[in-house]
Structures are given as C-alpha cells and as structure tokens.
Regions:
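Phosphate/dinucleotide-binding and metal-coordinating scaffold of catalytic cores
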Residues: 1-255
Length: 255
C-alpha cells in the first residue's frame, strides 16, 4: 500500500536499498513483507530501457489491459489524487499468487468530478484523454505506455469504450440524481458543511450537484473530441497538489 509519496512511489527506480522503499510502500501481509526485493524488481522492469518492447515488459509484469482501463476510468472521473493522475500515492499493488502478475488498485478516491480542484489543479484541461500524462512528478510507467504505439492504441480503444459506456452525460447525470435522492433527507441533519473540499466555491448541496454535472458535461465533450482527433502530444503541466486535511463536523477547512 502506498499512502504517501516517497522513494519509488511513482514507480521509478530509487536504488537497490530495500529500506528506502519501505518509507512509502507498506506491506499488508507477511508474504508482502518478504517480497520487497520482488517489488524493487517490478519497479526496475517498469522503467523500461533502450531496445525494449514495453508492450512485452508491461504484459509480463502486470495485468496490462486492466491497468490501461484503470487509467481511462481515473481520467474520465477526474480522480487525480493517485498514481495515474497527479500524485504518486493512494494505491495498492497486488501480486497474484499463481500468475505472479501485479495489479494496480487505486484507493481513497474522494476528490473526483471536480475541475480546477482546490482552485488550482486543471483536472480537465491538464489531463488529455488521448495523451494520458497529467502533471505532478514524472511517472515512468505512463511515459513508457504513451511512447509505445501498441499500448497507446490499446489505451485509446479502452478509453473510447469506457467513455461511451459509462460517462455519457445523460447516463451519468441520471445516476447522480438517483443517488442524491437516496441521501437527500439524511443530509439535512449531516454535521459536515455542505461543500466539497475540492470546491471552495460550493454553497450547498444543489451547488455541489451543479458543479459535478458541469464537470461531467465538459469532461465528456473534451474527451470525445480528443480521442477522435488526438493531435500532437501536449506539454505536461508539471503541477502537483496535496489535498488539505479533511473538514471536521461543523467546521470549514482553512483557505
């Protein structure tokens, strides 16, 4: 589990010392505790190298198609606070005991569906659907995927399918309305302030719904256009952001 950034958290090789990686990779089982050398081997392999077919590297180390699909879902939902977004943390790595392939499992996805998050992070304009390289520190696995024509083509195929299957505005907004209806009454007595920590301008639950719907519409329109005509690779906006502490009941987070 990676809860905070540190050596190797962006899946970039940080040297041979296993202790360095333990600063951010927390083993959750006895098997994982004994497998730090294997983790470092994974990170080294994912770094690629000259005259290496990265499609083969990724496929030999990870469940590649699942990772590509996850990249697309995180982008469409604006989940920037994890490895395939801006910040190299908030994920688990799981290795299947039989296939020995690794899977990437993002977690703590509480800052999605918010553009200009915290008033700073360009979640839509800075995260190109056809060139999925957001800001933050370098992430070799994403860079190598984008540089590999077959992997990039596979990612775009998955992204188009996911966008049309799950992120069409009429579908997603209808689901949002149904989910809100389920919790509307309990929210009347909820002790937390009626705003999202990502959106300082929220003024109530109707405002929150409106900002989420605007995100859904803009993200879909731009992603559809970008996947239809990828164009040239854009420059990466190298901005990272650590979310503030979560608000406490009856209080607002500091500005």
């Amino acid at each position: 589990k990676v809860h905070r950034p540190g050596p190797g958290a962006n899946l970039a090789y940080a040297g041979p010392r296993l202790e360095d990686y333990k600063n951010c990779f927390s083993a959750k089982t006895a098997e994982a505790e004994a497998a730090y050398a294997d983790l470092v081997g994974l990170i080294q392999a994912l770094g690629g190298g000259k005259n290496v077919l990265y499609e083969q590297v990724l496929g030999s180390q990870m469940v590649a198609d699942d990772f590509l699909r996850t990249m697309a879902v995180m982008l469409m939902a604006g989940c920037f606070d994890q490895l395939t977004g801006w910040n190299p943390h908030n994920y688990y790595l799981y290795r299947h005991p039989v296939t020995q392939q690794w899977s990437y499992l993002p977690w703590d996805l509480d800052v999605g569906f918010a553009d200009k998050a915290f008033g700073k992070v360009p979640v839509i304009d800075g995260w190109h659907a056809a060139w999925p390289l957001p800001g933050g520190p370098p992430k070799p696995i994403l860079e190598n995927i984008v540089k590999d024509p077959k992997l990039l083509a596979s990612y775009r195929k998955f992204a188009r399918s996911i966008l049309e299957s799950y992120f069409r505005p009429e579908k997603l907004k209808a689901r949002l309305s149904k989910l809100y209806a389920l919790i509307e009454e309990p929210l009347r007595t909820d002790p937390f302030p009626p705003r999202r920590v990502t959106n300082p301008e929220d003024t109530g639950y109707e405002s929150i719904l409106d900002s989420i719907e605007r995100f859904i519409e803009k993200r879909y329109a731009l992603a559809a256009a970008q996947l239809k005509d990828p164009g040239e690779r854009p420059k990466t906006i190298s901005q990272s952001h650590r979310p503030p502490m979560e608000p406490q009941p009856g209080t607002l987070p500091h500005a």
